[in-house]
Regions:
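Phosphate/ATP-binding catalytic cores across multiple sugar-kinase/actin-like superfamilies
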Residues: 1-4, 281
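Residues immediately C-terminal
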Residues: 9-10, 46, 283
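Hydrophobic residues within well-ordered alpha-helices
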Residues: 13-14, 61, 249
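Acidic, divalent-metal-coordinating active-site segment for phosphoryl/phosphodiester hydrolysis
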Residues: 7-17
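C-terminal transmembrane module of polytopic membrane proteins
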Residues: 112, 173-176, 196-289
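Membrane-embedded transport module
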Residues: 1-2, 24-218
């Protein structure tokens, strides 16, 4: 319960309320000290606007977290595959850092600039006990979006080996020599290209994910692709970084990457719509429309 007041006699009610709101212009010093919030312009419409912005901030944090956690799952899956399939890791540590501290940063921050969603003021108040990271968010991030990205990344890894004439049994036989860096130069070159493909696929999938995360409820077709231009700026910087990591000789040595064939780059174009369409279908299924 929120209570507004401006006089000395309102102080007890302002203290007892869940949220005490004192008038900034006409309110007394006693009322302002007793309140939780001071309404600087004495305009009650500002309270409504503040609530709407507060809900937008809460929603945007959830969008940000969904986006980040999804890529974490995609980064974790290659190491599960290494353990259970006895293959070399499809990502190396510095490539994971390139995603977490490089390519993911600006698109994630752009989600924090999303405007309040339509109908957000029609939703009931959240319970105090409701966690920010609840089960539906974690399931969506880890078990749906992240799992799809991880499977796509592993698909890219195996695709590079397959196009070079290796099946999974042969890859398992090479695992020990690759991990010890004792494999021949040709094998190591293929391995670096395969991990680079995994890295690029996950980054490309995150482009679809950032649009999917713009709303937990609404379709991207309703929101529009160009209503948050910061996302496009983030994607542009993201691809400048990832292409530099892939094609710069200096960065290749640091991140253990290799130049990708043009045909591999064309495959990356399929990744964003794969993630976005899958989440659009999930939203439609949940809404029942």
């Amino acid at each position: 319960v929120a209570v507004t007041g401006d006089g000395v006699n309102d102080a007890p009610a302002l203290r007892a309320a869940n949220i005490g709101i004192a008038m900034g212009i006409s309110g007394t010093d006693v009322a302002r000290e007793a309140a939780d919030i001071v309404l600087i312009d004495d305009n009650f419409a500002t309270i409504v606007a503040a609530i709407e912005q507060g809900r937008a901030v809460y929603q945007n944090i959830r969008k940000f977290m969904t986006y980040i956690l999804a890529s974490n799952m995609a980064e974790f899956l290659p190491f599960l595959a290494m353990v259970f399939l006895k293959i070399p890791p499809a990502l190396v540590i510095l490539q994971i850092l390139a995603i977490d501290l490089g390519t993911d940063m600006l698109p994630a921050l752009a989600l924090g600039a999303e405007k309040p969603e339509a109908g957000s003021m029609e939703l009931p108040p959240r319970k105090k006990s409701q966690p920010l990271l609840d089960l539906p968010l974690l399931l969506r991030a880890y078990c749906f979006l992240g799992l799809l990205e991880g499977l796509a990344g592993m698909g890219g890894f195996f695709f590079v080996w397959w196009t070079n004439g290796y099946n999974i049994t042969q890859l398992q036989a090479l695992s020990a020599s690759i991990l010890s860096h004792s494999a021949n130069a040709t094998t190591m070159a293929i391995y670096y290209q395969a991990t680079t493909m995994t890295l690029a696929v996950i980054v490309a999938c995150q482009d679809g994910n950032v649009f999917a995360c713009r709303s937990e409820r609404f379709s991207i077709l309703r929101l529009g692709f160009f209503t948050n231009r910061l996302i496009w700026a983030g994607i542009a910087v993201e691809w400048f970084l990832i292409l530099s990591i892939i094609y710069s000789p200096t960065l290749q040595k640091i991140f253990s990457t290799a130049a990708l064939k043009p045909s591999y780059l064309l495959i990356l174009l399929l990744c964003p719509p794969l993630i976005l369409i899958a989440d659009e279908l999930r939203k439609r299924f949940i809404s029942g429309t």
